[in-house]
Swiss-Prot record:
It comes from the Bacteria. GO terms for molecular function: iron ion binding; N(6)-L-threonylcarbamoyladenine synthase activity. Transmembrane segments: none annotated. Required for the formation of a threonylcarbamoyl group on adenosine at position 37 (t(6)A37) in tRNAs that read codons beginning with adenine. Is involved in the transfer of the threonylcarbamoyl moiety of threonylcarbamoyl-AMP (TC-AMP) to the N6 group of A37, together with TsaE and TsaB. TsaD likely plays a direct catalytic role in this reaction. This is tRNA N6-adenosine threonylcarbamoyltransferase. Binds 1 Fe(2+) ion per subunit. It comes from Wigglesworthia glossinidia brevipalpis. InterPro entries: ATPase_NBD, Gcp-like_dom, KAE1/TsaD, Peptidase_M22_CS, TsaD. GO terms for biological process: tRNA threonylcarbamoyladenosine modification.
Length: 340
């Protein structure tokens, strides 16, 4: 069974082909970072415009490069939410129109379920239940996964998501959007003992997150200098990243204790951060647990995860329960369960 996946939840246009027997055949992403960087963030109207421009050529390209005929596709999976309304509409309309033309089924996929299950593309599917942590530009959530389609959000972010916090602090340091990845690069040259950022919401019980205070702390710290040299930027970046890592580790310990889970899946754009990965590996090793990451190339938004989840749902033949066009606020908890 061959599934075409379409991803247009925000500003990345993605297309992929997944084979139930062979696995991921091909996936490609067209980024809009160079377009939005001049505005300091994603401009929804421009995202929609460039999705419309890019989607058809991208799909044509993956079929050409995979030597697979469009007629061989058995179904089309597309991101239906959460995300930007205009962006979602472009992908959903394209996918549904193509499916109608080919007379094959289309299925709406939850973007966060795609992220959550991305590690399964690389690894053998872990046994349920397991604990998942999604850390991206728009979401920071602990998810208890009891089955495919049966999820409970047990920890959430009360304000800025983790990836958003990285980008905002990077901007304060003069790094162009999206600056989170570049912040991590300069943090490697930073002195870990020069500055200290608070570890938000770690002195209180619970596994919710809050990162807006770190942005304020960084803003005040930057403002205390009349002029910041390059080393100071590196030192601030290091202190910020250390705070993030410590906070995530503390929260993961609590979440693992609460759920009694020995399995932790980490996904989303921020999960590509290597210092964070190292600390999470040490954490799970100390607990004799199992840790699963997404491949770094699949941490950010992509269609491979959408095609993969689509293949699971088509295999279960449970498409009617998810027959929505788009839902910009679609929660993981609102996904219908698929019976084994």
């Amino acid at each position: 069974m061959l599934i075409l996946g379409i991803e247009t939840s925000c500003d990345d246009t993605g297309a992929a082909i997944y084979d139930l027997e062979k696995g991921l055949i091909i996936h490609k992403v067209i980024s809009q970072n160079n377009i939005h960087s001049k505005y300091g963030g994603v401009v929804p109207e421009k995202s929609s415009k460039y999705h419309l421009k890019n989607i058809q050529p991208l799909v044509e390209n993956i079929f050409k490069n995979s030597n697979i005929s469009l007629s061989k596709i058995d179904g089309i999976a597309y991101t239906a939410g959460p995300g930007l309304v205009g962006s979602l509409i472009i992908g959903a309309t394209f996918a549904c129109s193509l499916a109608y033309t080919l007379q094959i089924p289309s299925i709406a996929i939850n973007h966060l379920e795609g992220h959550l299950l991305t590690p399964m593309i690389k690894y053998k599917r872990p046994k349920f239940p397991f604990l998942g942590l999604i850390i991206s530009g728009a979401h920071t959530q602990f998810v208890l996964a009891e089955d495919i389609g049966k999820y409970k959000i047990i920890g959430d972010c009360l304000d800025d998501a983790l990836g958003e916090a990285f980008d905002k602090v990077a901007k304060l340091l003069g790094i162009k959007y999206p600056g989170g990845k570049k912040l991590s690069i300069i943090a490697k040259q930073g002195n870990s003992k020069r500055f200290f950022f608070p570890r938000p919401m770690t002195k209180k019980p619970g596994i919710n997150f809050s990162f807006s205070g770190l942005k304020t702390y960084a803003k005040n710290l930057v403002s205390s200098f009349s002029k910041i040299d390059n080393q100071t930027k590196c030192d601030i970046a290091r202190a910020f990243e250390d705070s993030i890592i410590d906070t995530v580790i503390i929260k993961c310990k609590r979440a693992l204790d609460i759920t009694n889970s020995k399995i932790l899946l980490i996904s989303g754009g921020v999960s590509a951060n290597e210092p964070l990965r190292k600390n999470l590996r040490n954490l799970m090793k100390s607990r004799n647990g199992k840790l699963f990451f997404s491949k770094k190339s699949l941490c950010t938004d992509n269609a491979a995860m959408i095609a993969y989840v689509g293949s699971i749902r088509f295999k279960k033949n449970k498409t009617k329960d998810l027959s929505v066009l788009i839902n910009p606020k679609w929660s993981l908890e609102d996904i219908s369960r698929l019976e084994n």
